């Protein structure tokens, strides 16, 4: 089925133009042993780490939004991936949204990123480090054609494919969300080494960035993991379904009311905000 095209700039909706959520009132990580609680789209985190904004291997975008918090496993993954990318001469890794100090629901742009286990990473690898002005107002590089059926050849590179593959081969990573056209190109380029493609999942938008998701940490007992992706490389009928015309009578699903918070997250809000 053909998926509805959504504007790339939706990922960059300014929080200033949207109503704040209670989670934005928590300005520092909640003290305690690191615990991811609930699901990726309905949860929170205790004991989040702050990603250092200064690094030789990566740069953090939109630091004014203060979305550079996550579980210590996520911080270590970013440091690990960017070091590997630098060792291979790929360029500087550009880090987008992680989570807020206590996780929880954003005021716009994301439904996930709530448990400190998601990170958005730009699919461009500058050889020259970006200025502060560029980092505060990053310009996304749309890799997908206007019709959504393939990548733009002049913008695609083997370095981008290598970055995605490096992330997918990390043992802590369970899913990487990219545009269907990007997944399709990865399938074409992969050759015989294809096991890592299982983790790369086609999804709406994601035309200029990938969203990397880690597994629930073993000691986060209230964290809800997703089932593993289906076996195989995901390059067959499932992927092709994203490029098919919509079925007759297909309508846009109604916007759902957010579910109740996990009790531990509600208790956290009650203590620190309400």
Swiss-Prot record:
InterPro entries: Hedgehog_sig/DD-Pept_Zn-bd_sf, Peptidase_M74. Zn(2+) 1 binds at residues 110, 113, 120. It comes from the Bacteria. Disulfide bonds join 44-265, 187-235, 216-223. Residues 225-274 are annotated as: Disordered. Its cofactor is Zn(2+). Murein endopeptidase that cleaves the D-alanyl-meso-2,6-diamino-pimelyl amide bond that connects peptidoglycan strands. Likely plays a role in the removal of murein from the sacculus. It is an enzyme of class 3 (hydrolase). Keywords: Disulfide bond, Hydrolase, Metal-binding, Metalloprotease, Periplasm, Protease, Signal, Zinc. This is Penicillin-insensitive murein endopeptidase. Residues 1-19 form the signal peptide.
């Amino acid at each position: 089925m053909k998926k509805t095209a959504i504007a790339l700039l939706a990922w960059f909706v300014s929080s200033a133009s949207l109503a704040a959520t209670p989670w934005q009132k928590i300005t520092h990580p909640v003290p305690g042993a690191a615990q991811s609680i609930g699901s990726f789209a309905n949860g929170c985190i205790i004991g989040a780490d702050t990603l250092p904004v200064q690094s030789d291997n990566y740069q953090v975008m939109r630091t004014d939004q203060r979305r550079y918090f996550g579980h210590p496993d996520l911080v270590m993954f970013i440091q690990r991936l960017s070091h590997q990318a630098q060792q291979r001469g790929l360029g500087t890794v550009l880090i987008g949204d992680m989570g807020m100090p206590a996780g929880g629901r954003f005021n716009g742009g994301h439904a996930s990123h709530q448990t400190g286990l998601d990170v958005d990473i730009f699919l461009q690898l500058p050889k020259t480090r970006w200025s502060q002005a560029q980092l505060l107002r990053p310009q996304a590089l749309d890799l997908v054609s206007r019709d959504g059926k393939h990548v733009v050849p002049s913008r695609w590179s083997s370095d981008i494919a290598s970055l995605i593959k490096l992330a997918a081969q990390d043992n802590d990573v369970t899913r990487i969300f990219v545009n269907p056209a990007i997944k399709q190109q990865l399938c074409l380029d992969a050759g015989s080494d294809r096991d890592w493609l299982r983790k790369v999942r086609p999804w709406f938008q994601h035309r200029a960035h990938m969203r990397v998701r880690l597994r629930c940490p073993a000691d986060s007992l209230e964290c809800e993991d997703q089932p593993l992706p289906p076996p195989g490389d995901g390059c067959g009928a499932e992927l092709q379904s994203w490029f098919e015309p919509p079925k007759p009578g297909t309508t846009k699903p109604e916007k759902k009311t957010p579910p109740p918070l996990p009790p531990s997250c509600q208790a956290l809000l009650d203590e620190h905000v309400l």
